[in-house]
């Protein structure tokens, strides 16, 4: 196990995209969303979805999508303050080209959508192409993930590593998923009964800092004794670094380095080698 984790007292894990791997479920979701888009725009949607996954588009994980003005907002990785605004096609807009006080009004509430992880990519792309009222597509994807047709991608070494440190460290799950979904997934992953604390319906990123502070109080630890582990920079990593915690960020953009307190990995299994 990596020293960053070994030297900590509390490990805080996200669920989706962290405790299991793969993108098959995102692709399944995208195909359902494609059916909600008019036939003349469907191929453009699927092409853009592929470009975003291949990092060949203005939209990437860690940015905000303005669904009202169809704009993409780039954030400072530590402060999460807006710094640049792009069109969907990738044109950088000057302040003069934006509505008055536009930057100051950006937040995490609709019409602004933080693109925190892989779930948001197909959804935001579908909004760009006119899809509306598509929550049933997310529900259908979750239902598919509960069937035998879906093979959940396990993280190599995860269960063994957690079992080895369970008696010496506190292991916490902090997720936006609901209790029913969490219980089902943990059972599928054979990770049930490993966590000392499970926080569901977490309302990240709006309540991430509150949860972290509650964890510090509950386990009587200092910020630098906690590691937040996840694939969503906005939800899990930036709030942790802001409070003085450590972070493990799971991303394909492994050249990213914003802090000495942050370990960037392509796959979670790298920290268990």
What is the predicted function of each stretch?
Residues 2-61, 80:
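Active-site neighborhood of HAD-like aspartate-dependent phosphohydrolases
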Residues 2-7, 39, 159-163, 172-273:
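Asp-based, Mg2+/Mn2+-dependent phosphohydrolase catalytic module
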Residues 10, 48-49, 82-90, 97-98, ...:
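Surface-exposed, interaction-prone regions with an acidic/low-complexity signature
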Residues 12, 103, 113-119, 146-172:
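Short, acidic loop-to-helix structural element flanking the phosphoryl-transfer center
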Residues 21, 25, 154, 204-208:
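Phosphate/oxyanion-binding active-site loops and adjacent basic polyanion-contact surfaces
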Residues 26-34, 46, 115, 119-123, ...:
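An amphipathic alpha-helix signature
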Residues 36-50, 130-140, 193-194, 224:
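Short, surface-exposed acidic
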Residues 54-143:
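A metal-dependent, Asp-based hydrolase signature
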């Amino acid at each position: 196990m990596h020293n960053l984790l070994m030297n900590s007292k509390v490990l805080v894990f996200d669920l989706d995209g962290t405790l299991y791997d793969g993108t098959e479920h995102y692709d399944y979701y995208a195909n359902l969303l494609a059916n909600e888009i008019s036939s003349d725009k469907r191929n453009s949607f699927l092409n853009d979805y592929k470009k975003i996954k291949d990092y060949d588009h203005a939209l990437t994980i860690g940015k905000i999508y303005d669904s009202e003005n169809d704009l993409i907002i780039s954030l400072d990785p530590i402060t999460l303050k807006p710094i640049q605004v792009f069109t969907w096609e990738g044109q950088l807009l000057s302040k003069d080209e934006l509505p008055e006080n536009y930057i100051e009004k950006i937040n995490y509430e609709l019409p602004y959508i933080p693109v925190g992880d892989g779930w948001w990519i197909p959804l935001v792309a579908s909004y760009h192409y006119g899809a509306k009222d598509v929550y049933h597509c997310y529900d259908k994807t979750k239902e598919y993930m509960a069937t035998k047709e879906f093979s959940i991608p396990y993280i190599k070494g995860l269960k063994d590593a957690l079992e080895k440190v369970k008696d010496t460290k506190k292991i916490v799950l902090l997720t936006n998923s609901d209790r029913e979904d969490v219980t089902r997934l943990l059972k599928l992953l054979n990770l049930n009964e490993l966590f000392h604390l499970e926080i569901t319906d977490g309302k990240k990123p709006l309540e991430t800092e509150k949860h972290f502070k509650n964890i510090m109080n509950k386990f009587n630890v200092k910020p630098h004794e906690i590691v937040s582990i996840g694939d969503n920079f906005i939800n899990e990593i930036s709030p942790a670094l802001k409070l003085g915690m450590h972070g493990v960020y799971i991303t394909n953009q492994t050249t990213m380095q914003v802090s000495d307190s942050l370990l960037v990995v392509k796959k979670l299994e790298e920290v268990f080698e």
